[in-house]
Amino acid sequence: MITIIAAVAKNRAIGFKNKLIYWLPNDLKRFKALTTGHTIIMGRNTYLSLPKGALPNRRNIVLSKSMWKEECGMRKENTHAADSATDSAAFSVPEGNLIPHSTFHIPQKDSTFHIPQKNIDVFPSLEEALAHCAPDEDIYIIGGASVYRQALPLADRLCLTEIDDTPAEADTFFPPYEDDWQEESREDHPVDDRHDFPYAFVDYIRK
């Protein structure tokens, strides 16, 4: 199942200068509860905005052609270096001994790279990422705007936090969704000592 999760203002604003506009503790708590143990897919800017990098206890997928090409280039260099070392060693090996060829090659038909240092999988596109997910995998699309736009036609469900406010400044917006989705459940929350605006947890399914 593909689920889009986001916090949106009345005008569908979601961010400003690559940062969230609203800081809602209950929204963050809900986000953690829904996504923990599952796969999250995000764009490069969303990944870079995470204070501590990859989110724990989740499979983190980052969509980025530049990161993918960079990782591809680094791995090719490592492969070529390993091959060169093997070729050089061949001149000094006694006859009859076999030298194992480098086993670290980039799969020609696989476009994914796992970066263990960052605990992320990198794909050049959403299509490629979804192709490398299991059919029964619970997938959460967490942003940003361009990834939301790409994922919206493919999504099965929307889990939105709708905030009863229109921010003064915003440069990133969630795509229009009202015409194709119907409300499945709603949980309204008033202003309190930790939340400056009324908000609602709203789940949508396709009409």
Q: Model features per residue range: what roles?
A:
Residues 1-2:
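Absolute protein N-terminus
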Residues 5-68, 119-207:
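Flexible, gly/pro- and Lys/Arg-enriched active-site loops
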Residues 65-120, 131:
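Intrinsic disorder/low-complexity segments
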